[in-house]
Amino acid sequence: MIEVKHLKTLQALRNCGSLAAAAATLHQTQSALSHQFSDLEQRLGFRLFVRKSQPLRFTPQGEILLQLANQVLPQISQALQACNEPQQTRLRIAIECHSCIQWLTPALENFHKNWPQVEMDFKSGVTFDPQPALQQGELDLVMTSDILPRSGLHYSPMFDYEVRLVLAPDHPLAAKTRITPEDLASETLLIYPVQRSRLDVWRHFLQPAGVSPSLKSVDNTLLLIQMVAARMGIAALPHWVVESFERQGLVVTKTLGEGLWSRLYAAVRDGEQRQPVTEAFIRSARNHACDHLPFVKSAERPTYDAPTVRPGSPARL
């Protein structure tokens, strides 16, 4: 059977006018190209061009295949170009990480400058559970620290971050060198309005120790920080979220146990992670976060249905 490479070779021979010139264009030796034509002609059962003709003359069969090359090769080129061009015109994004809005908004603006043709649709809400919506095709990408096993989703790591205990500067726990789960038993833990089972501090610090402090929901980060500063409770937040408040002296942060680390992922439906728009957004958002957020570590290795990696926790390394 004739292959695409044979059509390209025939076209090069027509354009160049001789075996020697065609061989140079194709970065082959003249003898190798001559052998290739002889082998093809033997398999096809007919000659393609007249040897040693000046100017080079193609046989009727060769002319037919040249017409085929002129029709097929441009179509192949156009198809490959279409495959490499973005087919998405809209990117529907949601977050499970309440604190992520602080860096994701400028990351979205930065991405839109380079991909102005892509409509960005950002969905958020304290009662919104985005991963099932992603599975059902209602969203294209979700920022999350939770991996759903056997979900049909692909999780691209964004960055690792430490969850720190956030306290008023004059809180008694601020003087402790080591924070244990029992230290929080009598405290009021201020949390975002999500189920406690989705909180890293609950799943990986308090629950294993059998400690259950009082919980109070707060809608946004700024109010939460103000309540902590007023000794109305304590909180557990990503270090990068509270860095500016800590620098101002409004709050202090402490390491939880040996260090509680989590990883943020960009979740998409498996098989769609290589779509040009999706891939470009994940790369752009990751780079923006790692360039602008303090106390985060870049994480680029793809993860499929794996538990959250927590650097510094030997049981999870």
From Swiss-Prot:
DNA-binding region: 19-38
InterPro entries: LysR_subst-bd (IPR005119), MetR_PBP2 (IPR037406), Tscrpt_reg_HTH_LysR (IPR000847), WH-like_DNA-bd_sf (IPR036388), WH_DNA-bd_sf (IPR036390)
Record GO cellular component, one term: cytoplasm
The keyword Ribonucleoprotein is assigned to this record: no
Subcellular location field: Cytoplasm
SUPFAM superfamilies the UniProt entry points to: Periplasmic binding protein-like II, Winged helix' DNA-binding domain
Gene Ontology MF term list: amino acid binding; DNA binding; DNA-binding transcription factor activity; transcription cis-regulatory region binding
GO biological processes: methionine biosynthetic process; regulation of DNA-templated transcription
Protein name: HTH-type transcriptional regulator MetR
Pfam families: HTH_1, LysR_substrate
Gene: metR
PANTHER family noted in UniProt: HTH-TYPE TRANSCRIPTIONAL REGULATOR (PTHR30126), HTH-TYPE TRANSCRIPTIONAL REGULATOR METR (PTHR30126:SF25)
Organism this protein belongs to: Escherichia coli (strain K12)
Keyword Protein biosynthesis in annotation: no
Domain HTH lysR-type intervals: 1-59
Bilayer-crossing regions: none
Job of this protein: Control of the last step in methionine biosynthesis; MetR is a positive activator of the metA, metE and metH genes. MetR is also a negative regulator of its own expression. Binds homocysteine as an inducer.
Family membership noted in the UniProt record: Belongs to the LysR transcriptional regulatory family.
Keywords carried by this UniProt record: Activator, Amino-acid biosynthesis, Cytoplasm, DNA-binding, Methionine biosynthesis, Repressor, Transcription, Transcription regulation
